[in-house]
Amino acid sequence: ANSLMLVNREAQPANQPPPGVAGGLGIYDVSSPSRPREITFWRCGGAGVHRFTFDGRYAYISPEMDGYVGNIVMILDLADPSRPQEVGRWWMPGQWVAGGETPSWSGRAHRCHHPIRLGDRLYVSYWHGGFVILDVEDLSKPRFVSGLDWSPPFITPTHTALPVPFPLHGRRVMLAADEDVAKLAPGSPSFLWLVDITDERRPVPFASFQVSGIDGSPQPEFTGCHQPCEKITGTEIPVAWFAHGLRIVDIAAPHAPREVAHFLPAVPEGHSRVCSNDVWVDDRGLLYLIDRGRGLHILERV
């Protein structure tokens, strides 16, 4: 957006960065796409920034910050991309240990995965803390509206909280994708939820979608749901479904979501199975499906 490209940098336990390489957010000028130029690098503490969304001016990010346990919500103003300015932040009570708070959970189980903005609300996935809805009418003071945490009893963490930008049968609906990793116990793969947020103070899960052939028996991680396309153009939602490839789910009848198309890539060389990680759609309707191991497929709906 606005000829800017943002790239998160994050240290992973299995792939520690070399000395001197920090986590944060890289900001690039891509007005000449073949010659991207780094404008600046915004640094943060801990492992860095896990994921983000960007509307052309504000970046809604999930950084680790000194004094906090796990990633928090932060809003950066990139009006001057050479000087990113923090506008506001929010964290789940218990994360700010430097401020005297004590988490009610162990480790980094409750942490911001990433925020998605629609209007004056942020819809924030919070891993094993479920999801929260924040009022950002005043960007400097994000305010808690509501939240819902279903793990436990469900065993997988929430990866994406994605509001549908149009009503379905007169109701406001949010999609919630749980990620098939970091399970609280052995169990069946994660799936996609539909949540009624017509009364946003009282979100109500009312439907779900799981791929066919799942019988409830325990499966390895990276089998189930991961990420829905965060650009919604209609009721057909492309979803990256790890070992099951790309699934296109029609939510036109929200109480009965159904699969209308799918694509299973070939297993990448050097890997034992498919691991479809992310999917995006461009203005032409082309789909871009990335494998977590290696490879990119460009697809069209027929």
Feature annotation, model-predicted:
Residues 1-302:
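Feature marking well-ordered beta-strand scaffolds used for ligand recognition
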